[in-house]
């Protein structure tokens, strides 16, 4: 019984330890809870609007935010992982500046290429389709 009680008392310490070194980043486009320890987002919140434009992602690459410790493009030179958007640029393509902001490293998590270009892309496309169906 004492071990169970100790476990229950310590569980929140372990469960929320990752939040100690996390930063809440609010922008007009999305909100990110970013872990500087893991150098990736823990979660991202954004609104999915019906597509009203099609900004070109040509020439865009991920970039760092000076106020937060993140990985950078050099970390991915010889890496097998894709830099995957958490708030997808396809959902934020109504304006070039908005889409550019989706390329912050704080909005990126390393993903296996097959995941990023496979089921994750299908999920992003499906969410956009649902927004169009519901006219949101």
Q: Which functions belong to the PLM regions below?
A:
Residues 1-2, 56:
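Short, intrinsically disordered low-complexity segments
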Residues 3-14:
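Sec-dependent N-terminal signal peptides
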Residues 15-136:
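Domain-level detector for secreted/extracellular nuclease and nuclease-toxin modules, and
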């Amino acid at each position: 019984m004492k071990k169970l009680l100790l476990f229950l008392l310590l569980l929140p310490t372990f469960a929320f330890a990752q939040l100690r070194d996390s930063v809440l980043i609010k922008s007009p486009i999305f909100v990110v809870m970013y872990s500087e320890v893991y150098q990736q987002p823990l979660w991202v919140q954004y609104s999915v609007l019906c597509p009203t434009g099609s900004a070109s992602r040509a020439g865009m690459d991920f970039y760092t935010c000076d106020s937060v410790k993140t990985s950078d493009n050099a970390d991915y030179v010889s890496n097998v992982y894709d830099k995957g958007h958490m708030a997808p640029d396809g959902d934020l393509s109504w304006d070039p500046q908005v889409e550019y902001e989706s390329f912050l490293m704080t909005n990126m998590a390393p993903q296996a290429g097959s995941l990023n270009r496979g089921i994750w892309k299908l999920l992003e496309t499906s969410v956009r389709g649902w927004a169009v169906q519901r006219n949101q």
